[in-house]
Amino acid sequence: MRIGRRTDVEQVHVSEHGCSVLENRQPVRPAEGLGFTVLPDADGWAPEVGFVQGFPVARDPGAGIAWLAHCYGMLGAGRAMAADSSVGNELYVVTGQSPRQLDRNITTVGRVVQGIEYLSVLPRGTGPLGFYEAAGQRTPIRAIRLAADVPEA
């Protein structure tokens, strides 16, 4: 599996990147200068949606902000209430219906660029929200690489 590198769309640490946090949610960044390709479709979660460098992005032109959207193939990291509290030990990949209600609520950190077909067929857990109830149900991740670290073919 290959994971796309973070782009300038996302901001992970408020103090490091100087971005703003809205209502204790995932940091957003100024939308200006992103090279945003807007989609014509209406969206119930943001005034506009589209892509920046292949990443699904939502934006609010009125507020001048943009954020990564929770779409199929996006990689997220669980966190506590503080927007910069994720340590990366709780990762997930969106493999079904896009949970857009998680936009700006749970941190997105990248996207799967190769291998999503293997992730999407893994059995779901039997616990609440599809979590695995027993450690033996979990599928180990044997390798994850940043796309930037993979030699060109």
Where are these regions (language model features)?
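Cross-family detector of peptidyl-prolyl cis-trans isomerase
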Residues: M1-A153
